[in-house]
Amino acid sequence: MIEIDGSFGEGGGQILRTSVALSAVTLKPVRIFNIRAKRKNPGLRRQHMVAVKALAEMTDAEVRGLELGSTEIVFIPKTLKAGTFRFDIGTAGSVSLVLQAVTPAALFAPGEVRVQLRGGTDVPMSPPVDYLRFVFYPLLERFGAKTELVLKRRGHYPKGGGEVEFASRPVDSLTQWGEVERGEVLKVRGLSHCVKLPKHVAERQAKAAEEVLKKSGLKNVDIDLEWYPPERDPHLGPGSGIVLWAITERSLLGADSLGARGKRAERVGEEAARKLLEDLSTGKALDRHMSDMIVPYVSLACGRTEVGGAALTMHAWTHVHVVKKFLPELEVEISGELNKPFVMRVKGVCWQR
């Protein structure tokens, strides 16, 4: 059985999600201890439990220790299944983090997988669902992944109530992909939304972001608005946010910012724009989030690649550490300092369904 110390690196929930995701793909049993050891409230929270439950259902797994606050679980998968699965994370637990855990297993399932999730789509400490829709899954397509993510309803902190539907078709293996440099920025797209709030909130977020981007010299900027009149607003809300993504010659890079009580709409827009410009300024092909989220996919894919990331996060280091436990033949070499631009050279294991 593979043993994973959950206090390694950044010591958060990502170690748990990645470990159980790769256990589901490889069907190798795993014991994870010291779960979220470096967090103020260690142990499993509801969204972590739902991620494990989802993968347990997809693999007929035996799971021990799965309860709120637990700092150790054992996950013993039996067989990877296709089908339709429904999970309610409750209130504003992150649907994006659950989807990150489920996606690798869904791709290697023996048939189509559909996952319906309720929870938070736009919540702190988690990629917003629009980042997955417009950056993460489109980049996975370059590996040959066939996925679809439909946003049914948004859910913000603290009430949640969001709904998404994810679907994937199986792959026999992933085609390797990677770029070091992003190439020229062709255009910047964005989506600024607000629910249970006046329309001007979404407009001001978009306008502020556009001004920062254009002032930097970017010309082709187009940010869509999403807003609902009170009589047709199905959300629990209130909440707002913006996601921006740069379409470049060789890649996609994204950035986001969430609204909050007392935070001016202009600040939300400016924050997202500055994050995007900061990552674009490195010239690398991947933004700081994708630099980490791509690790399992370049590892499972067939062949060698090089990817350039805007910032080497502790998340990325942690990801590599965990993936190597499940794929010992994996070769990874990282050139760069923590929180600085970096290049990762990978020889994937060519995992076959």
Swiss-Prot record:
Catalysis: reaction(s): a 3'-end 3'-phospho-ribonucleotide-RNA + ATP = a 3'-end 2',3'-cyclophospho-ribonucleotide-RNA + AMP + diphosphate
Residues the entry annotates as binding ATP: 100, 289-292
UniProt EC number: 6.5.1.4
Compartments it resides in: Cytoplasm
Cross-referenced PROSITE patterns: RTC
A Pfam family recorded for this sequence: RTC
SUPFAM superfamilies, alphabetized: EPT/RTPC-like, RNA 3'-terminal phosphate cyclase, RPTC, insert domain
Keyword line: ATP-binding, Cytoplasm, Ligase, Nucleotide-binding
GO annotation, cellular component aspect: cytoplasm
Active-site positions on this chain: 315 (tele-amp-histidine intermediate)
Any GO BP: RNA processing
GO molecular function: ATP binding; RNA-3'-phosphate cyclase activity
The family this protein is said to belong to: Belongs to the RNA 3'-terminal cyclase family. Type 1 subfamily.
Function: Catalyzes the conversion of 3'-phosphate to a 2',3'-cyclic phosphodiester at the end of RNA. The mechanism of action of the enzyme occurs in 3 steps: (A) adenylation of the enzyme by ATP; (B) transfer of adenylate to an RNA-N3'P to produce RNA-N3'PP5'A; (C) and attack of the adjacent 2'-hydroxyl on the 3'-phosphorus in the diester linkage to produce the cyclic end product. The biological role of this enzyme is unknown but it is likely to function in some aspects of cellular RNA processing.
UniProt xrefs under HAMAP family: RTC
Listed name of the protein: RNA 3'-terminal phosphate cyclase
Naturally occurring in which organism (per UniProt): Ignicoccus hospitalis (strain KIN4/I / DSM 18386 / JCM 14125)
